[in-house]
Amino acid sequence: QNRRDFLKTAALAAFGSGLVARQALAGESLLSTIHINKLGLGGKMKMTFFPYELKLRHVFTVATYSRTTTPDVQVEIEYEGVTGYGEASMPPYLGETVESVMNFLGKVNLEQFSDPFQLDDILSYVDSLSPKDTAAKAAVDIALHDLVGKLLGAPWYKIWGLNKEKTPSTTFTIGIDAPDVVRAKTKECADQFNILKVKLGRDNDKEMIETIRSVTDLPIAIDAN
């Protein structure tokens, strides 16, 4: 049974078993107006996208450059009045640009597919449009999964049968900066992440580590570039 059939079966089972009602009672945000006959049986998907500039809370500095913004392109896929959101983020070292992402997304035609539950078919089609453009492809992928999750009324960890308490740890990156800024950044993230990634590569490496250690004993990963 492929993923498309699984999702349609899951959709019918979720609504038929009262899963949505139980989640609603638990206080989760659900699309209670979605009906079974809207799940994979009609309508067309509409994709829109636009560029925007993500403004960073702090200047982000590594050994070779600093930046205060990250260029992004937001993708929205609408189906039956429900919208899924995704984005392509293009930090300078990835080699993609707003222009390249916009050009790729302009080639994507989702209206040829009958519904968003055709995940495998849609993503295979998107991937076939270019051997590169991974950020642009990821934006469509994320928006599509967001849309399907909303139509099912459940987060993806539940759809996949995963335990959110076993989510692998990820890092928060602290860029090179003055001690007071590094201290502030560390305080902001210390209770939200299990590992800190620290950018090094200048003359203040020791000072960076000592400043972070004055705030927290969290494990530190070093990224010197």
Q: What is the role of each PLM region?
A:
Residues 39-44, 49, 65, 77-78, ...:
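Metal- or metallocofactor-binding catalytic centers and their adjacent structured scaffolds
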Residues 39-43, 62, 154-165:
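N-terminal amphipathic alpha-helix/helix-capping segment at the start of soluble metabolic enzymes
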Residues 8, 137, 197-199:
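A general lysine-centric signal
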Residues 22-23, 146-156:
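Short helix-capping/linker segments at secondary-structure and domain boundaries
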Residues 20-56:
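C-terminal segment of N-terminal export signals and the immediately downstream linker at the start
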Residues 68-72:
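Short catalytic helix/loop segments, enriched in acidic residues and glycine
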Residues 156-225:
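Metal-dependent enolase-superfamily TIM-barrel catalytic cores that perform enediolate-based chemistry
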Residues 1-14:
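N-terminal secretory signal peptides and thylakoid transit peptides that target proteins
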